[in-house]
Amino acid sequence: MTHDNKLQVEAIKCGTVIDHIPAQVGFKLLSLFKLTETEQRITIGLNLPSGEMGRKDLIKIENTFLTDEQVNQLALYAPQATVNRIDNYDVVGKSRPSLPERINNVLVCPNSNCISHAEPVSSCFAVKKRANDIALKCKYCEKEFSHNVVLAN
């Protein structure tokens, strides 16, 4: 029996590959982190087969590298993700997101009375690890929410 080990998503010469994104989360990451606001080529793989996860999403962004802050902000959506730095088609660095203390300019406060909806301010949430959950506390209204509530917003 032979195995077909072809790449299902084309390799990139230089840039970032975000791998092991839970299935159905890839598009959310693209929009929340404004990854599409670039002139660079972006390749997206959705519902790809994965031995570990069953199915996964994958994002490849050419000639773009994520900051440590951006990598860590992925932890809310894709805690098992691997962020690979690619140079000349080789993986030259790997990192995994770890939960940051704060998340800025990404999420929207679910409190409709929060000042962040009416004023031109950047969103800011403090991240707090709980026993079975992650809580996010808005800097402006000071209300605390389960991360699932904020992510669904």
From Swiss-Prot:
Please give the superkingdom of this protein's source.
Bacteria
Q: Does the keyword DNA damage apply?
A: no
The GO terms describing molecular function are: metal ion binding
Question: Which annotated residues bind Zn(2+)?
Answer: 109, 114, 138, 141
Which InterPro entries does the entry link to?
A: Asp_carbamoyltransf_reg_N, Asp_carbamoylTrfase_reg, Asp_carbamoyltrfase_reg_C, Asp_carbatrfase_reg_C_sf, Asp_carbatrfase_reg_N_sf
Cofactor list? Zn(2+)
Q: State how it assembles.
A: Contains catalytic and regulatory chains.
Name assigned to this protein = Aspartate carbamoyltransferase regulatory chain
